[in-house]
């Protein structure tokens, strides 16, 4: 059952705070052991890890249900998507970073540095060029196993599979995220509650490491995200700490359970989803979050999620094309039969919307699919009458 909590502001009413006045923190689900790594899957809902149960769950915004998405997940922690929409996950039990391919199987991407096994890859982010950045602290190394590395690193895995050590000076590197323009990288040193920032040079090199902010509370910093304004959201002691791009404290979302991570969700990316304690929460914000699906720049194809209005006999399906191409956009019913073709022809670069009149179909689950040669993606759509 969902619960609502009034947010108690911990600062004076700062005008820069992205938390709206009177905002309510909503508990969506509870009873998990170690929820982590939330990420929004367009057309489906919120994916999140339960490390202790070695399971990835899916929370659905349609009926607020929670179902098993992947089990066993080898104690997955951080989750994100690459630019092809494939799930990227850190697997603590296997001490590696992996990818889930279209058929649902798991493909290991990297598990060693210079022939030595990683400590325990924790959090992960994908840059819009396809490179994967991740942290590798030594907590949660599986029982009976030892650390083979004498440092705890921050790494970059290039789109061609080349692994690069970016930093080896942290005590416990944990949360990791980019600024909206990807010119800054943020990583926190978890047990010290220090957030650092670098300049990203030539897409792959870090420079000018600087302390951005030190959380003034006992505990540890965990997962982090940014919004479109560059504001940083760091889960940590007693709540989600909100900082300006220059490291000025703006506000804190006070939490009834200790938060472990957060991410943006819903079609407009204006809801912050938070894993905390044994539960999942959300809160609506005044700002829009940075997508974690590899589509942050306009150079990629995108088929956007859709939530039909039951009071409207039609619905809009939106998509983006980075280049001119032949585009079939079709709708299928739940057993794969084609219902209608919305687009069939060549379109130039740009953003598009196509209307589908649902008055002639019954309530149920449908799928809309965009095909552009090598790029094919489908989204689920639910018609309610």
Predicted regions: what they are:
Residues 3-12:
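Sec-dependent N-terminal signal peptides
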Residues 60-64, 101-105, 158-161, 200-204, ...:
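Short loop/turn segments that connect beta-strands within beta-propeller blades
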Residues 296-385:
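C-terminal outer-membrane/trafficking sorting elements
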Residues 46-67:
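Beta-propeller domains
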Residues 24, 30-45, 72-91, 95-96, ...:
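Beta-rich, blade/repeat-based domains predominating
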Residues 53, 94, 148-152, 192, ...:
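A detector of repeated loop/turn-to-beta-strand junctions in beta-rich toroidal repeat architectures
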Residues 16-32, 209:
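A short helix->beta-strand "capping" segment at the edge of beta-propeller domains
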Residues 55-57, 96-98, 152-155, 194-196, ...:
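A short loop-to-beta-strand structural motif that recurs across blades of beta-propeller domains
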């Amino acid at each position: 059952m969902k619960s609502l909590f009034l947010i108690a502001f911990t600062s004076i009413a700062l005008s820069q705070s992205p938390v709206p006045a009177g905002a309510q923190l909503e508990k969506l689900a509870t009873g998990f052991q170690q929820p982590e790594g939330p990420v929004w899957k367009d057309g489906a809902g919120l994916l999140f890890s339960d490390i202790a149960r070695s399971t990835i769950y899916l929370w659905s915004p349609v009926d607020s249900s929670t179902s098993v998405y992947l089990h066993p997940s080898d104690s997955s922690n951080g989750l994100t998507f690459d630019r092809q929409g494939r799930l990227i996950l850190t697997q603590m039990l296997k001490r590696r970073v992996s990818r889930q391919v279209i058929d649902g199987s798991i493909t290991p991407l990297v598990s060693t540095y210079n022939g030595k096994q990683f400590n325990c890859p924790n959090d992960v982010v994908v840059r819009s060029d396809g490179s994967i950045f991740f942290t590798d602290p030594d907590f949660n190394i599986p029982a009976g196993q030892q650390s083979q590395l004498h440092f705890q690193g921050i790494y970059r895995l290039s789109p061609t599979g080349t692994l690069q050590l970016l930093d080896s000076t942290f005590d416990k590197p944990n949360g990791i995220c980019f600024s909206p323009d990807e010119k800054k990288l943020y990583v926190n040193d978890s047990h010290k509650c220090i957030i650092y920032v670098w300049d990203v040079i030539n897409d792959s090199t870090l420079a000018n490491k600087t302390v951005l902010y030190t959380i003034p509370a006992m505990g540890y910093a965990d997962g982090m995200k940014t919004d479109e304004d560059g504001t940083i959201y760091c889960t940590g002691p007693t709540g989600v700490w909100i900082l300006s791009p220059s490291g000025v404290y703006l506000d804190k979302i006070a939490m009834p359970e200790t938060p472990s991570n957060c991410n943006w969700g819903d079609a407009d990316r204006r809801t912050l989803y938070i894993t905390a304690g044994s539960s999942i929460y959300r809160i609506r914000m005044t700002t829009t979050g940075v997508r974690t699906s590899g589509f942050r720049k306009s150079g990629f194809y995108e088929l956007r999620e859709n939530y039909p209005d039951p009071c409207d006999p039609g619905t809009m399906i939106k998509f983006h094309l980075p280049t001119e191409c032949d585009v079939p956009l079709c709708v299928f019913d739940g057993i794969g039969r084609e219902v209608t073709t919305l687009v069939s022809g060549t379109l130039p670069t740009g953003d598009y919307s196509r209307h589908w009149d649902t008055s002639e179909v019954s309530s149920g689950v449908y799928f809309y699919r965009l095909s552009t040669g090598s790029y094919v993606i489908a989204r689920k759509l639910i018609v309610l009458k």
